[in-house]
Structures are given as structure tokens and as C-alpha cells.
Amino acid sequence: MKEVIDTVGRRKTSVARVFMTPGKGRVIINKLPVEEYFKDEVRRSKALRPLALTERTEEFDIKVNVQGGGITGQSGAVSLGIARALTEFDETVRPILKTEKLLTRDPRMVERKKFGRKKARKRFQFSKR
């Protein structure tokens, strides 16, 4: 068994590099405690959901470097990274995480803007005359 488990999680344009070591349950994201980084309870619970489901919140110290995107994409990226790290540490948690779809990379990305349109799908205002 490796001492440090490192995995990558992605969501939209966010990339999270997760480093998991056996410890006391500290979660550090970009050198800040998770409570400071994700001030919103919804984003924080989304990011830490794999730990809560597998009931391993106090077993590991997790250090995360996350960059790109917004706060929602980053919380999704952290969640995927933690889920992958837990699976790498212990294969028995895989079915639990898989049923909750926490091991699946969300493929949805922002659709590009097309020419002749205001946004990706929105058209310019139509003028009859």
C-alpha cells in the first residue's frame, strides 16, 4: 500500500489534484481548511460526499490543489478526486460510490458560441420590419 495516494478529479474546466494520506480527517484545499475554501455548506457537502458515504471522514488527511473554473465546478472536481482516491485505497467502497455516481466524470461542458448567434443557442432579436 502506498503512503500517499494521488488522484485527479475534473469537472467543467476545473482540475483537482488530490493527495490522501492516513491521518486525522483534515481536509486542506489550496492551503485553506475546507470550511474556509467552500464557505457554502452545499458546495462543502458536495465536495466531501464520498467521505461521508463511506464513513471515513476521520481516517484520512486530504490535501487538494484545485484550479480553473468556478466554485461549483471545483467542488465537483474535488468530489471526484476524493472518490477516486478512496477507491484506490480500498476497492470495497467502489460499489457504494458507483451507485451514487461519484466515480463518473461529468462530461457536461459549456457549449461554444456560434457565429450569427448571440450565445451558443440564443439568436439575435428578430425584427419583422
Swiss-Prot record:
SUPFAM superfamilies listed in its UniProt record: Ribosomal protein S5 domain 2-like
Keywords: Ribonucleoprotein, Ribosomal protein
GO cellular component: cytoplasm; small ribosomal subunit
GO biological process: translation
UniProt superkingdom: Bacteria
Molecular function via GO: RNA binding; structural constituent of ribosome
InterPro entries, per database record: Ribosomal_Su5_D2-typ_SF, Ribosomal_uS9, Ribosomal_uS9_bac/plastid, Ribosomal_uS9_CS, Ribsml_uS5_D2-typ_fold_subgr
Record flagged with keyword Ribosomal protein: yes
Keyword Ribonucleoprotein on entry: yes
Disulfide bonds: none
Family note: Belongs to the universal ribosomal protein uS9 family.
PANTHER family reported in the protein's UniProt record: RIBOSOMAL PROTEIN S9 (PTHR21569), SMALL RIBOSOMAL SUBUNIT PROTEIN US9M (PTHR21569:SF1)
UniProt cross-references to NCBIfam families, sorted A to Z: PRK00132.1 (NF001099)
Protein name stated in the entry: Small ribosomal subunit protein uS9
Organism: Chlorobium limicola (strain DSM 245 / NBRC 103803 / 6330)
